[in-house]
Amino acid sequence: MTLQKPFPDRPLTLAVLGSSGAVGAEILKILEERSFPIRELRLLASERSAGQVQFFKGEDLVVKKVSPEGFEDVDLVLASAGGSISRKWRKVINSAGAVIVDNSNAYRMEPDVPLVVPEVNPSQVFTHKGLIANPNCTTILLALVLAPLSAQLPIKRVVVSTYQSASGAGARAMNELKQLSQDVLNGNIPKSEILPYSLAFNLFLHNSPLQSNNYCEEEMKMINETRKILNQSELAITATCVRVPVLRAHSESINIEFAEPFPVEEARKILSNASGIKLLEDIQMNRFPMPIDVTGKDDIAVGRIRQDLSNPKALELWLCGDQIRKGAALNAIQIAELLLTRS
């Protein structure tokens, strides 16, 4: 099924699938902040979350159990309920005539599904066949930096290490980090139930499943999705992903090798003018981006841009970005806003 018809020239009937999760709740906040044109908003989730009340534009809205009836006459579905739910309901949603912006990893690497970061490859939105995939959070942050730099000089290789907050594992993981940190301070042994190990005053390699190549699933997402977004299938890129005891916002240490030497000041200028990026560098005070700088913010923060002393063609830099906002909810809504431009 190909769904490339423009949206109606009126406010949309919009469904948020998975509205009760951390990303779903953030979607509601951002829809209101950006005055997204909504005629009717439907909140859909699992049976466990049905009956919950969420707040939107001064009104209490009741979350309903996801069902085929919930998608009748819907124009757009923002889905953040996980890959299995997206796969289960895609055909039903598209058959009802709605377009899906999907936050899960279910369809990201499907050849005919656009994988979009609006600041990087916006035209891909209009190639959709009923579903547009939202990239992984760490991939979005990385792509925002790589795209404007690669427009200046070809990139030969990327080495990235991530420092991923509890928010990447959802609201329950954030609450667990708070509780286990208090347990440690009280002299008790922390017992993790949501994450595989205690994150309180601790860090561990990302807990997604290991693949046959000994990279974890999260690392392979970054590698494969970045290649697809930048349309560089042979890009040399490697990643190491780590979960750290931060509540919200991810960080990344990035080494980028170019085809030729890239002057540091030129890179600073390009990134400072790039959409979605705030340059944060106070060299005198040794002050660079931190997760608290970007928590609740739309833009990512980039700094510590410097020459790689071991490679004259490489630069080092550091970034922080809110995983729930630009890494998920905001990016999905920006995709929806692009779709509106074809109305």
Curated annotation (Swiss-Prot):
Q: Which domain of life is it from?
A: Bacteria
Q: EC number(s) of the enzyme?
A: 1.2.1.11
| Protein residues bound to NADP(+) | 20-23, 48-49, 167-168, 323
Residues the record lists as binding phosphate: 108, 221
Q: Where is the active site?
A: 137, 250
Q: In which pathway does it act?
A: Amino-acid biosynthesis; L-lysine biosynthesis via DAP pathway; (S)-tetrahydrodipicolinate from L-aspartate: step 2/4; Amino-acid biosynthesis; L-methionine biosynthesis via de novo pathway; L-homoserine from L-aspartate: step 2/3; Amino-acid biosynthesis; L-threonine biosynthesis; L-threonine from L-aspartate: step 2/5
Which reactions are catalysed by this chain?
A: L-aspartate 4-semialdehyde + phosphate + NADP(+) = 4-phospho-L-aspartate + NADPH + H(+)
List the InterPro entries. Answer: Asp_semialdehyde_DH, Asp_semialdehyde_DH_beta, NAD(P)-bd_dom_sf, Semialdehyde_DH_NAD-bd, Semialdhyde_DH_dimer_dom
Question: By what name is this protein known?
Answer: Aspartate-semialdehyde dehydrogenase
Q: Which gene encodes it?
A: asd
